[in-house]
């Protein structure tokens, strides 16, 4: 299939960019962007490659994404080697095809076509690309955003190319994401022999009533844009492995995906109050990986919806479900942020694939967003 979007996607897939290794993907993108007049600023931190690129001045529309991918798993189970892209029955197979090298290719080609048509565009078109999204995300977009904010860089709109669609490209646009807060809780007891419980203090028994109440809390009812806050216990560890030893400690890890109805401080306060209610001895560690954010109807959402309706003749759903994305960092800049990308049915799976025609359509949608906001 001869198509600049598909050809670039294949070139990116051939580079085995296991997070946080970029494997040359950004060099390929930078070469294409510089050729059409972009100024490119590499922003590497630690083992992570990032770049910020821009063309023009004024109101700024940035396209954001990541070049890194998750491991392929058992390569023998793929219909084709995972880093040797192939097209079968109109589907482009390869690790990263959907998440998210297909989107990156669509962004770059859309920019090339846009600049050719509007060489003197009125606004500023930008790219924020990282190689650290799938793993720790500590040296990627968050560090670039901190740098840009420190120098008062302008960012009005940001389109993240995460695979947002479910059945057909553009059927779902993510216009926000829930916050994510993890609690690492250790309940302290006194280790002892199971035959002499009066000489010990079993932390599992101590914690059980508290955990029962915790899992039954209704944190909120959600709102127009967000489902109710959820809390899930992810890990529980206790004991020595022996059947005659009362454990000395119990470790419980639980995660909150919370809406804009709550703050992380509200959640923390309620958990601590519950621990105090049951008079537990404990140690707490919190990890806030992202605050909730929401982009309401405005210029960016309207432009994205218009592009989808124009090219795919469907009205997209505006949703905030799913996991976190780098949009949570970009939203700190005060920008309107949405996510639009290909169908996500096979991301992180064996035989990850994307409809090749969808990538061509996505490039046209991206270009139309550019035309509406910075032409």
UniProtKB/Swiss-Prot annotation:
Record-linked InterPro entries: ArgE/DapE_CS (IPR001261), Bact_exopeptidase_dim_dom (IPR036264), DapE_proteobac (IPR005941), Peptidase_M20 (IPR002933), Peptidase_M20_dimer (IPR011650), Peptidase_M20A (IPR050072)
Keyword presence, Protein biosynthesis: no
Catalytic activity, as annotated: N-succinyl-(2S,6S)-2,6-diaminopimelate + H2O = (2S,6S)-2,6-diaminopimelate + succinate
Gene3D superfamilies, A to Z: 3.30.70.360, Zn peptidases (3.40.630.10)
Molecular function per GO: acetylornithine deacetylase activity; cobalt ion binding; succinyl-diaminopimelate desuccinylase activity; zinc ion binding
Coiled coil regions, renumbered to chain: none
Superkingdom classification of source: Bacteria
Job description of the protein: Catalyzes the hydrolysis of N-succinyl-L,L-diaminopimelic acid (SDAP), forming succinate and LL-2,6-diaminopimelate (DAP), an intermediate involved in the bacterial biosynthesis of lysine and meso-diaminopimelic acid, an essential component of bacterial cell walls.
Record-given protein name: Succinyl-diaminopimelate desuccinylase
Organism: Klebsiella pneumoniae subsp. pneumoniae (strain ATCC 700721 / MGH 78578)
Gene (UniProt): dapE
